[in-house]
Amino acid sequence: MENASESPLKKYRRQPKVFFDLPSRGQFYTDGVLYGNTYTSLPVFSMTAGDEILFKTPDALVNGEATAANIRSCIPSILQPFKLVTLDIDAILVSIRMATFGPNLGITHSCPHCKSENSYEIPLQKYLDHYNRCEYNDTLVYGSLIIKTAPPTYADFTEVQKKTLSYQRALNINAPKITDEKQRDKYEHDILVEIGKLQVEIIVNAVKSIEVEGVIETNKKEIREFLDNSELELIKALKKHIEDNTMHWQVPLEKVKCANDECGKENLVKVSLDQSDFFDLG
């Protein structure tokens, strides 16, 4: 007869291992993205075997589905991962790694001075602390214009990533196969034009409103038309504004010391949070 009592396996199911706050502080989210619109003390579960396999599937990484599926699995209070802003994605990935593999990340680095291979353990909590100290600058003042911006959503980011990859393949793989020089030049020119359009698209998508003389314009069509016909200096200012925010949110370089007694020099190392290798080894 089947035992109707609670399964003894229940207490061995995944439990939250980490709790963290979203660095964006929920600033850019509408109802339904986060459960209860809560962005603090989010519980993080460790990855399952299936989650880890997804991170090793190239197509799922490129289209963002691997990351989105892992977020749904490990942080169920995030209801719509593709509507997350990119400011939160790295902190989310760090917290999932901590919940799955522990608080440290092992890295190797070849000393540029003596060529010795060194191994280091990097505490990941420092990155969560870094993100929580960061502030997103959402305002650009350009002459009489007050421009409000927002970081891209994860959906926008993955779309740009897919297009960028397809253009790179076109230039590196398809173009060299064209034997006629004029046709090849035209093909490459057309691809470069598309890349230029993509860069403008990133800038346009970042602009949420433009205020002039006390009137605020939020209509995306009007904003696009205005920017398409604006002077180059405004576009450059917007591009710099976006790049400055991106740089501000990047993981700081790690200062490490070479373990070779004959060297012992300090080096700065950039730690990669790219999903393809960040989750490769525990």
What would you call each of these model-derived segments?
Residues M1-G282:
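Long C-terminal interaction/binding lobes of large macromolecular proteins
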